[in-house]
Amino acid sequence: ATQVSEVTSGMYPKNLLLIVVSVGIAVMLTIGLFRIVYRYPLNKTFTFLYLAIFGLAYFSTNDLFAIAFDASGSTTGALTVPFMLALAVGVASLNRKTQSAEEDSFGLVGIASAGAILAVLILGLFVRSDEPLSGSMPGHEAVAANWLAPFLHELPKIAGEILLAVSPILIIFVLNHVFFADQKLSKRAFRRIFLGMAYLFVGLVLFLTGVNAGFMEVGRKLGMLIAGMDSSIPVLIVGFVLGVLVILAEPAVYVLTHQIEDVTTGYVKRGIVLGFLSIGVGLAVLLSVVRVLIPWLQLWHYLVPGYLIILALSYKVPKLFVGIAFDAGGVASGPMTATFILAFIQGVAEITPDANVLLEGFGMIAMVAMMPIISLQLLGAIYQRNSIKEGL
């Protein structure tokens, strides 16, 4: 939100964007829970949502189109993903006697992500400008004499943001336990939950402080160094490898893969999902680098055919994999991707002739959110084919 406010010269204020995206996610989260209760098909839900998204995108600018899709990826982080996954499993467990219980345990993260896109596109209908982006990217600070200085600068800000994010969940839990819960938790269970919250707070503060204070500049410098070589082949290879490896450091990825293995009782192996997810993200970063190197290539050249493929596959592959794939798309675009890989792409753009750092900065997260959906639905097609062979 801060970056969008700066590059649009305040046309989309940070607080307004945060409120609009939050409302969009809240509305779609509610719709997603109703979908689980009434067992409405997930593929039809996503078809309707993305038809609405691309219908609104027709009336938006290319810049806002990229910002909207990036908003969907950057809102599904290390805190929101485990909460949404647990919420989906909890509601789906009410339908445990139905065959759709497994399928309904996934897809909520993907639906919430669509809410963020819709919210930003709707905002663009009311706050509109046909002028190209004219602001500036946040400046990169010079290396401080004290190596701790950047971390100490980020620490209070990150701590405040995490506290703001965790507090509502904790307050709602306590109020529900005190006033509404039929069965009270034991003191031991209550203590474990609060201890877990403390671990969560400390862990996220340390993790996000390190990511924001350390990795941003490293990624930018690496992008400039590799892109400055005589050939474009090295930057394409490095981009793919970074995409494959960075996803392994995303905390929410392990939450999702463990839940997939638990819900499917080992039918869908965690390692296989992680492998296909990594390949998808690697291809997303590679294609983002290609977009920087080829001036006429626009983000919608990727997203429109990409989501057409996704929606077509959603009617062919097992329904379980549709939910898993869309959730994986939200999970893949976490804090590591939104900092290190984003900075890497900006570094490549800085050194590439005719590339616009301002414009190339947006759209990369959207690519990372899209490609894993395709790769995991293809995994679903492989599972389906193997099941048919075993049946024969």
Q: Language model features by range: what are they?
A:
Residues 23-35, 49-61, 83-93, 111-126, ...:
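Hydrophobic core segments of alpha-helical transmembrane domains in multi-pass membrane transport
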Residues 41-51, 104-110, 188-198, 272-277, ...:
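Cytoplasmic-side transmembrane-helix entry/capping segments in multi-pass membrane proteins
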Residues 29-42, 64-67, 89-104, 179-187, ...:
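Alpha-helical transmembrane segments
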Residues 11-16, 58-60, 78, 194-197, ...:
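Membrane-interfacial loop-to-helix junctions in multi-pass transporters
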Residues 72, 76, 81-85, 91-218, ...:
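Signature of multi-pass transmembrane helix bundles
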